[in-house]
């Protein structure tokens, strides 16, 4: 999986480098973007390799972590794993990290109950001793950068989570990068004002991330393993595929067209009902997905449909392709209407609203 990034992406990487260069940062750096837009991919395959000789990166996924204690253990575990890798890469015969753990165990072993001492091999494992291990913002003379990913996917409250991250940044001196979908954090926050206030104290800067959709689509097509004819179909429709993924539609025009078509003079509907319909449409358009993973899955899945269409001697499959991609993107985003009492007819109305002229 490879995506190339434009000059704007390179500037973003420079911003990340500049933050890592700061000594004793006053706050964390947040890289914010929609789910599936390539944030983590950029960090792990573009940014980290570009500075791997200067810094040590400890990456922690917050997905599914439901307590601060578990988070602290996970941070230490990832730190220890990285330290062990570092030792191995430098040819150290016995990991200094393991030696540290053994020394700590020897210190506490004498204080354990006798029946625990007999089962010392269980307690003496590195993972059992994580809570006794101090971690440092330096690892073998290199600065350690903490990277917290999937901030919005944890079950810990935003306030508690950011407070914990702030402890690493402010009190322990770690440069800290947060990778998140900030809009989803706001959606799940019980008190958005509280989140905004604590974010202002803890997050030094927020960098919005928007991928280069033209390059994403182009590389997705060129790197895809598929039949020559099917790849030709994708290339033929590349500009429209970019339009679908980027969501490059005139939403104001869509709303005006909807109003002209549906708002009838002399109708029994009240003004408030029309306003409610318009607000619902605006909300739907604001949720138009840009998920790269969903897009890649859709163009891969359509190849089977394409092969069936070819067997049926259907000459031009472009409309089928575009409609399928629109439908799958909408479905993956959970935006398909499923009103069973009307059958299947009304399932696709949202797709038509999101992707006019293409579905």
What residue spans do the PLM features occupy?
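Conserved nucleotide-binding/hydrolysis micro-motifs of P-loop NTPases
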Residues: 26, 36-37, 63-68, 182-186, ...
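Conserved Walker B catalytic segment
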Residues: 138-183, 190-193
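Extended alpha-helical coiled-coil/bundle linker/stalk regions that scaffold oligomerization
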Residues: 296, 300-359
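Pre-Walker A adenine-sensing motif
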Residues: 2, 7-24
